[in-house]
Amino acid sequence: MTSEQRRVVLTLGFCGLVSAADNWFVSPALPAIVRTLAVAPSVVAVILTAYLVPYGALQPVCGAIGDRVGRVRLLRVIVAGLAVGTLVCALAPSLPALVAARILTGCFAAGIISVSQALVGDVVSAEDRAAAVGLLMGVTFTGQGLSAGLGGIITELVGWRAAFVCFGVLAVVAWLGVMRLRGVGEREADGGSSSSGAGAFLSSAVRTFFGPGRAVFLTAFTTGIIYLGVYGFMGTFLAERCGLSSTPACLLMMFYGLACLAGGSLSGRIGGWHGLRGTILVGEASGLAAAGLLLVSTVTGSWVPALVAAACLGLGYILVQPTLVSLSMDVDPAQTGLCTGLIGFGVFVGGGAGSTLGGFAISAGGYEALWIVAAAALALQTVIGWRALPQK
């Protein structure tokens, strides 16, 4: 990549970082929101769902819109919407108002990752694409790992409203960066056609998802189930089994984000050595190591293996997901925005399913069962993926 291309990728990565952080920083703030808004703890988790559902479900929609109207133009609108929505959340006087603001924010944030991924595909050469997407997603998911710790600290020091303001300001900075993107090599938008519409979009999306490239999209779905499913339970695991309070647990989870950043920087080299399918294999091996370390942590009650597991989980995820994005761009080069959006859709819908299935596993056999089931599922994904994914 040239220095200008790297600048574009890092600018887009920062936008993705803010969009990912905007979801995950809320989790440690939930107890404070319960106290301030005087609501039951059992219902406040709807704040997370209110953001995550549109964030995942609308990624293919935003990707397809970007294909038609232009990616930079769309990014300027949706990043601005993310900033405004996050700042509005800080002013919410009640839980219904906060939920409404989170839904609105999630709708704007939904397109940032998928549109940015497709734009990176426009900016860099095919040879540099895997490395560029890896760097983009490494920066993006650093936000997921770091935001939980930062959100918890800000909430403890100055309150949850201040946390929303801080992340809203970061979104404004991201918007200013997008406004400076000019002449970055985006291909011309197709401008729409008479056949466009909801029915045509759904038909195209289903045809693409279950078409010849279905192995790529279905692997994204199972990746979400396993990696995000495991990640979602690590915070409660650290509290219940390792005895860590909220802030130390959040700080430990920041190693997930640091590993994402490191893995995103290394993914291009790994791809050069082993190919795209080999990069996915390395990521899956790292995920298996994370499951094994979490099992050790469960048996011993020590948080040290869990710290290494958080890093392995982040490294594994950032090697698998962006590589699937790169493979998806070849499924239909005329609709790269839709294809990258379908990857995001698969991952986040899978993450939601993983949370539900993980809860069943814990109810049936505790955290030991969760880690064992996750390892078995990932081993199965590895075997099937090695045979089914494109040999690149």
Walk through the language-model features, giving the residues of each.
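Juxtamembrane intracellular "pre-TM" segments in multi-pass secondary transporters
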Residues: 2, 183-217
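Helix-to-loop junctions at the C-terminal end of transmembrane segments
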Residues: 59-70, 263-276, 362
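Helix-loop-helix hairpin linking two adjacent transmembrane segments in secondary transporters
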Residues: 126-182
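Helix-breaking motifs and short loop linkers at transmembrane-helix boundaries and internal kinks
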Residues: 36-38, 70, 91-97, 108, ...
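Cytoplasmic helix-loop-helix junction between adjacent transmembrane helices
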Residues: 101-142
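C-terminal transmembrane helical hairpin of 12-TM major facilitator-type secondary transporters
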Residues: 277-324
